């Protein structure tokens, strides 16, 4: 080894020992004749002193070094001078007096700073990601990710799950997003797909009698990106045989509870995890992934305002819409500009406008729409929303989906403005009873709302088989936390006839269904057990544990929102010979970027 200790290891117990360290020059301070260096590796920093009076050769050798040079130093550990200790540094009580030194590698001046955040553009940071990863914050996040995955593996093993790898080269089957396709050289004109998830394979493992499976699974989806999505992502894939919904929820809830307590003990959570139906989540929060760290519930005021003289409200109700409100505590003094700004937030969700009422100190209502309501109606609105003096009530009236989306935007924005979200609280919750089918207004048909292997709620099977699709619930469930969906799962179909029924709801011919899913239908003819599972997203979980809102922060080498790797310049063109071997050529008019 080129070192005897790491740069974060030395303490008072090591004083007077001769040690060798190796690492990067984090910072240099030249105090005339004496040179001070902060030497850095993954484990921490150690202050190094080069004194020419005791070691002129080492001082001369290190005279030309700059930040990020890689060096090796050997010397004696000594106590820092009184008053020079650094309580913020684990090694802050000692320093290393250099006896010999060696430059292992030089370094150009980095395009981004390592010893502090220089506010560089994200594109520059991603291009030089290997330098950004030297930063303390980034190394902390990668360490947190490692501990999270290790805890998952150890925990699943203790619970009797087997870790089994499933293929990366798979068959292309519709699972919601576009597949990444891989052409086959040995079978010209045919393609593999990279897995969007191991969904079918883990179900087939249950048919195989494996009973309890897990995998740290890499998944790829060719979809439009956003701050919490990447084209390739990692999930803890779980499947279990002979289980019902509560069994799966129990396993994942225990895992998450113990993981948070062990990996991030400063974080708190609410236990047991609350359960919301999908209908209630939409009704009260406008989202199937609500942030429950703060209240700001929606209140349906349709019954109160239906006989008012305010045409916006009555018009929405008469056309099948709804009117909902949120009480914003302490915001009654908002200026007209502040309210107009908030109305623009509501419009992002599709609202045409946003009505408001401010509650004055004497309990009276100040609002441009107050004149359209009787005093009894105003009192009812205050009572229904629990509004008090100094509060602001905001309203949106429109189609139910627009009201939900608009007030969800307002709710999240106000939580930021009022600083309502506790960053140290991991507020997990289960969302259950999702609709099994969605009405397609264009086709006039009811389409499956989930992947086609999701089981219908047992209580609604007969209703589904009668063709009464509205209100049929899926045996599916989501784990949400702090406004993000962390995991999605379901009890799976294991009965061939029900699986065939669901496949028949897909927009494919019987021949196409057999081509795409025949292997699943055949497997279910050989004794498939009842089974279910889910797949917590590791990237999003670590994102929350690390207190960041950008998933790229928690992935070693992420892609941009245009699915580009700026460091390796991918995707890139390939030469004509490679295409010919695959039986491919670029379509006319398609020109690679370079």
UniProtKB/Swiss-Prot annotation:
- Annotated compartments: Cytoplasm
Which residues lie within the region annotated Aspartate?
199-202
Indicate whether Signal appears among the record's keywords. Answer: no
Q: Per the UniProt entry, what is one GO biological process?
A: aspartyl-tRNA aminoacylation
For whether the record's keyword set contains Iron-sulfur, the answer is: no
Binding of ATP occurs at: 221-223, 230, 485, 537-540
State a GO cellular component annotated for this protein.
Answer: cytoplasm
Q: Name one GO molecular function term.
A: aspartate-tRNA(Asn) ligase activity
Top-level lineage group: Bacteria
Which positions does the site annotation Important for tRNA non-discrimination cover? 31, 83
Give the first-level EC class, as a single word.
ligase
Q: Where, in this chain's numbering, is L-aspartate bound?
A: 175, 221, 450, 492
Q: Which reaction does it catalyse?
A: tRNA(Asx) + L-aspartate + ATP = L-aspartyl-tRNA(Asx) + AMP + diphosphate
* One protein family per Pfam: tRNA_anti-codon
EC number, UniProt record: 6.1.1.23
Q: Supply the alphabetized keyword list.
A: Aminoacyl-tRNA synthetase, ATP-binding, Cytoplasm, Ligase, Nucleotide-binding, Protein biosynthesis
Function per UniProt = Aspartyl-tRNA synthetase with relaxed tRNA specificity since it is able to aspartylate not only its cognate tRNA(Asp) but also tRNA(Asn). Reaction proceeds in two steps: L-aspartate is first activated by ATP to form Asp-AMP and then transferred to the acceptor end of tRNA(Asp/Asn).
Q: How does it assemble?
A: Homodimer.
Family the UniProt entry places it in: Belongs to the class-II aminoacyl-tRNA synthetase family. Type 1 subfamily.
Q: What name is this protein filed under?
A: Aspartate--tRNA(Asp/Asn) ligase
Organism, scientific name: Herpetosiphon aurantiacus (strain ATCC 23779 / DSM 785 / 114-95)
Q: Which gene encodes it?
A: aspS
